Amino acid sequence: MKLVCRQNELNTSLSLVSRAVPSRPNHPVLANVLLAADAGTQRLSLTAFDLSLGIQTSFAAQVERSGAITLPAKLLNDIVSRLPNDSDVTLEDNDAAATLSVGSGQYQMRGISADEFPELPLVQSQEALQLSASALIEGLRGTLFATSGDETKQILTGVHLKVQPDGLEFAATDGHRLAVVKTENAAATPATEFAVTVPSRALRDLERMIAIRGSDEAIALYHDQGQTVFQWGDQYLTSRTLDGQYPNYGQLIPREFNRNVAVDRKRLLAALERIAVLADQQNNAIRLSLDPENNRLALAVDAQDVGSGQEAVPAEIIGEPLEIAFNVRYLAEGLKALNTTDIQIQLNSNTSPVVLSPLGPVKITYLVMPIQLRS
């Protein structure tokens, strides 16, 4: 193998695939990145695989000789990231070693034969669902933040993706809040409906890949028992799916409300972030008071031995006055995800689920449970 490529392209590709390199590999070759050069296509592909998540990306290079080798991911990344930006990098392998040259610098690295690197899993289903990149990104940004970080609740650490004839539905919950996004899939209508829960780690990497290597072309989703693959062009991400029954989240969302608040999202978020500085570190609690008589939403925190704070935001309120408390982080993260000018807050009591949604065409539902405070 012998090739010349740009430092910035190699560096970007390494940063993408390195996220699939395990921190404690159970086989030495899994700590490496597979580099494969093709003189026919004049492209260099990089692959990393931890036996659960696999990422493959490629870019244009001047390939003199085809070939493949695996090199230590961390060492290669550390060297390439320190090379001059946009410089020409020459990479040549010789048996189980590789030489990387740039300008007057030359680096030799021991590698492992490409034959020892495991192949990325193939999905047996022949038919792929074509997803529009914009619909995929919209769904991921509106739900990923609500996944659980608790590995004992394994099914809740992923996003539940439901493919329907009229589009895609994304859902995520950690048991305290629920985010649901419905998007139209402009790319194609699925032949069959299906649902799959994909680990949030894989989907965050997918979101990052689309942002860096995305294009206007559709993204193909292949799904088979236990495995999901996203592919566009020569970009490829494969992930094991999460086992178990995802909660029936639809039944958690109330159908009727006796109170409704319409408010400017950015104004409420700004007030929330200011007052959150004083929120009690133990429960992150903030009180919201609905004041329909004065058309305002009052925010208050009272942290023992720290201090207190109050804010008020203009709002259109339908219904009776009410005082309710929330975890300030859950409320702020939901407001950030809604990403529209005006939102509505629908609620019934200070002990029942509260639903936030945008006023407009965007179909996002964010449900959050209030918390109970001692008087």
Swiss-Prot record:
SMART domains given in the database record: POL3Bc
Subcellular compartments: Cytoplasm
One annotated GO biological process: DNA strand elongation involved in DNA replication
Keywords, in A-Z order: Cytoplasm, DNA replication, DNA-binding, DNA-directed DNA polymerase, Nucleotidyltransferase, Transferase
Signal peptide: none
GO molecular function (one): 3'-5' exonuclease activity
Protein family membership: Belongs to the beta sliding clamp family.
Name of the protein in its database record: Beta sliding clamp
Organism from which the protein derives: Synechococcus elongatus (strain ATCC 33912 / PCC 7942 / FACHB-805) (Anacystis nidulans R2)
Lineage: Bacteria, Bacillati, Cyanobacteriota, Cyanophyceae, Synechococcales
